[in-house]
Amino acid sequence: MSRVVVVGGGFGGMAVAARLAKTGHEVTLLERSPDLGGALGSVSEEGFTWDAGASYTLLPAVLRDLFRKTGRPLERELELEPLDLVREHRFEDDTTLALPTSRAGQLRALDALEPGLGERWAAHVDSFTEDWEVLRQHYFEHPWQRAALPDPVRRRFDSREMLHKRLKKTLKDERLRELATFPFLAEGHDPRNVPAWMGLVAYLEQRFGTWHVPDGMARIAEVLAARLATRGVTVLRGTPARDVVLREGRAVAVRTDEGDIDADEVVVAVDPRGLPSLAPLVERTMPAIPPVVCHVGLEGDVPDLPHEVVLHGDPLLVVRTGGHAPDGRHAWTIHGRGKIAEDLLRALARHRIDVRAQLVHRVDRSPRELVQQWGSSPLGVLWQGRSTVRARLGPDTPIPHLHTAGAHATPGAGLPFVGLSAALVAERIGPA
């Protein structure tokens, strides 16, 4: 049995703590705030409740695997349901696309928008099939060997082709390019700096669908917190980690204000920049910055919108309608990116979605406030070209017995990838 200290009680830290405890390790989890879950939480005011971060996820198998390997299966703990639509897109030329999750549905919807668009989009998505299969085996689902990458992986990681450049060659319709780049723009990345192979996100959306928890995504964190208690994890809330203690070049403890907590293995599931011993290892990276967020409580008649609507342009606006509200009321969240020179609800009204008269409550959150609340950006490391994939830590680090998980670790941000990061660390450490 090894003593493992996990730094960070967001989804990544909770997932890796549960996995390691189930395999027999003595696990202590440190969380700086009073609550677990991090960005996988909720905001509640005046009877309204909104998802604080993600409102849906990809790759449901990641959650199912986590729950199956740490105790009761997912289906016995919470509802995880598929969504019929990936999202609705409203383009600057006043055309609208409700994008289904299935390949056949996407073909039909795009051909209805303009004949021939469906086949072009299908060919684009299909082109990432091999990327996913190669990287799934050697990067996403198993700890990668940085010094001995298989040739198919090395070719992708060394490629200078960025997503923007590939799309200019393969997708001549501006609306299709906006479909392909939206997931990255929404998380603060410039497609000119995102490797082309990361376009596989469109493949994952189509192949595996988008899924949500009807009661709110925070339920995942609540159930995981109970799972930690079941597995005997010692959870220290309100206990920020100040640094990882190194002795003879290896990690031996985590420093807190109350003293050092000895460890045989340390897992850092927060932004490494916040820990002096790790900061030099990530000095070539930058965090991706959260959007401007406005949670609104509405009353009366409002437009009937799907769970997510993307309003293309500058600023880029995203409307999420799946919050919980009392009868006769509605809970929406609006994200804004780009040139935001006016109130988000006023900007929304310019797209003919005017709910200012229905507003009864609002919660505004700036990028700075979000980072301060969570201690770091939940969007992880900013893509700065092909070097980013190697500059990001995880599951190992150059320091023996020190590992990283979470949004700032391999393989990246987003609920499914953070879940995979936890599985990678658990596999690397192994059973007790």
Regions found by a protein language model. Give the residues of each.
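N-terminal glycine-rich phosphate/pyrophosphate-binding loop and immediately adjacent elements
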Residues: S2-E133
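Helical element adjacent to the flavin cofactor pocket in flavoenzyme catalytic cores
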Residues: L200-A251, R255-D257
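A conserved FAD-binding loop/helix module that cradles the flavin
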Residues: A54, A407-G430
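C-terminal segments that line or cap access tunnels to active or ligand-binding sites in enzymes
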Residues: C294-Q373
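Rossmann-like flavin
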Residues: E92-P195
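Hydrophobic anchor at the start of a short beta-strand
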Residues: H25-V27, V266, A357
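Mid-domain catalytic core of redox enzymes
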Residues: R242-R329
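A glycine-rich dinucleotide-binding beta-alpha-beta segment and adjacent secondary-structure elements
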Residues: D173-E187, D354-P411
